[in-house]
């Protein structure tokens, strides 16, 4: 089998004559790397003999009673995903910093950062899910993996430092939990796709990473997902979380892979926090804030039963104990912006994460969360996707000066709409609205969320 390093070199040499795309823009002007290599692994002949076990398109069976866009054919949806994937990969996958490495370019920053672990996680999931359509998916995935391994956190070689600069150095050894969780999930996807045909032990690496996440990025007292590896019991932020770091389908996958019932309780307790916030602070809209503080939650005795056949134990909880829970939205400027306690650029991902869990597991906790959210967003927009604002307070009112399109807000509402047939016309409108934008219309964050959400909306997302 050809080495990854040689494959990337050959691909870079061939790029200029084998792939063009009408949606290209001026090349990135990074410090040391020939960025013409960014399209090196796109659209070229296969360099590996092995085929993925679950090639795109998968048309995965989702939970009974959920919906997909029904005004266009499956073939048209799949083609839309393929087309946008080509544009996304060409623009965002960059070869560097080492000869066998690639990263997801953190476009749009005015600073010196070229990559964040959040984007690396997005990219590794996307590439693994698009294997089969992309003949070079495994080579690309492995290059992304090597970049992640070359930039570890200071506390663990299995977690990724949260950001890297143009000189290919990590700013510090801290982590971002969402990036680590997506990378770990992608390793399980990679194992399902190519596990028997790789020099990288994807499953073993996933298990090491899952264990590191468990011990460094989840609060052992409350089972709540923390913001990073930087919080200890002495930290003021020890009982805080970023709402978008709760990815219940990932936690279920970690449970299946590791056999650790810790993840069962983590799913239950994080859902309980979300339910409390909806009921207490957003009873009309069903929103949660970017950051949640002072979380205190008991851990009642629970029993579990499988969500679907073959998913294994521990997917859906039954709880009989009296709940004791408290939490508050973060104050302004808690960490990032005046809107840290609002539904802003972090929490906008929550509908996607919860809906993805419902599509795969059918958990009634996810259904209950979405049952509040979906009627509100349809009503407040009058059924017009163009009226979705780029941010809301928890009462469901638009944040000031946010009347512009932001796919990071729009796409997750589309995934949320899949939860019920009541949303069918709304979902159809959202699909059409999303796909009419080109890659050049938005930056890394919006486009990467759009890419993952299109995979889900077309019925091509699955659990490893």
Residue ranges of model-derived segments:
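Solenoid-like repeat scaffolds
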Residues: 432-440
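Active-site-adjacent structural elements in enzyme catalytic domains
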Residues: 139-150, 185-189, 204-214
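Intrinsically disordered, low-structural-confidence terminal and linker regions
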Residues: 19-51
């Amino acid at each position: 089998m050809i080495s990854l390093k040689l494959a990337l070199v050959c691909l870079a040499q061939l790029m200029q004559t084998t792939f063009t795309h009408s949606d290209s823009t001026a090349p990135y002007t990074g410090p040391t790397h020939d960025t013409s290599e960014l399209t090196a692994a796109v659209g070229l002949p296969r360099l590996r003999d092995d085929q993925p076990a679950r090639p795109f398109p998968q048309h995965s069976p989702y939970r009974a009673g959920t919906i997909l866009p029904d005004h266009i054919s499956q073939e048209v949806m799949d083609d839309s995903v393929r087309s946008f994937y080509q544009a996304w990969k060409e623009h965002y996958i960059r070869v560097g910093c080492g000869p066998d490495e690639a990263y997801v370019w953190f476009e749009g920053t005015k600073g010196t950062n070229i990559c964040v672990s959040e984007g690396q996680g997005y990219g590794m999931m996307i590439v693994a899910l698009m294997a089969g359509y992309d003949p070079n998916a495994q080579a690309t995935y492995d290059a992304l993996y090597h970049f992640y391994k070359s930039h570890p956190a200071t506390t663990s070689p299995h977690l990724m430092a949260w950001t890297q600069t143009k000189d290919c150095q990590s700013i510090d050894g801290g982590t971002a939990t969402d990036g680590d969780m997506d990378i770990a999930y992608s390793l399980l996807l990679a194992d399902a796709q190519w596990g028997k045909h790789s020099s990288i032990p994807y499953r073993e690496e996933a298990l090491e990473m899952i264990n590191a996440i468990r011990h460094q990025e989840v609060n052992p007292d409350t089972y709540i997902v923390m913001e990073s590896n930087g919080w200890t019991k002495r930290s003021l932020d020890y009982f805080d979380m970023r709402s978008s770091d709760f990815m219940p389908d990932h936690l279920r996958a970690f449970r299946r892979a590791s056999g650790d019932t810790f993840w069962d309780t983590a799913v239950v307790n994080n859902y309980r926090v979300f339910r409390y916030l909806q009921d207490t602070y957003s009873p009309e809209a069903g929103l949660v804030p970017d950051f949640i503080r002072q979380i205190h939650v008991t851990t009642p005795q629970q029993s579990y039963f499988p969500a679907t056949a073959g998913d294994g134990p521990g997917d859906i909880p039954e709880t009989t104990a009296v709940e004791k829970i408290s939490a508050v939205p973060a104050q302004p400027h808690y960490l990032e912006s005046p809107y840290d306690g609002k539904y802003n650029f972090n929490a906008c991902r929550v509908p996607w994460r919860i809906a993805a869990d419902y599509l795969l597991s059918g958990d009634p906790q996810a259904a209950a969360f979405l049952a509040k959210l979906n009627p509100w967003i349809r009503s407040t927009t009058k059924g017009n996707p163009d009226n979705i604002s780029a941010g809301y307070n928890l009462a469901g009112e638009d944040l000031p000066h946010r009347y512009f399109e932001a796919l990071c807000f729009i796409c997750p509402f589309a995934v949320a709409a899949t939860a019920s047939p009541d949303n069918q016309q709304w979902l159809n409108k959202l699909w059409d609205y999303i796909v009419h934008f080109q890659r050049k219309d938005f930056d890394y964050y919006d486009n990467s969320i759009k890419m993952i959400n299109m995979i889900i909306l077309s019925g091509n997302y699955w659990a490893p």
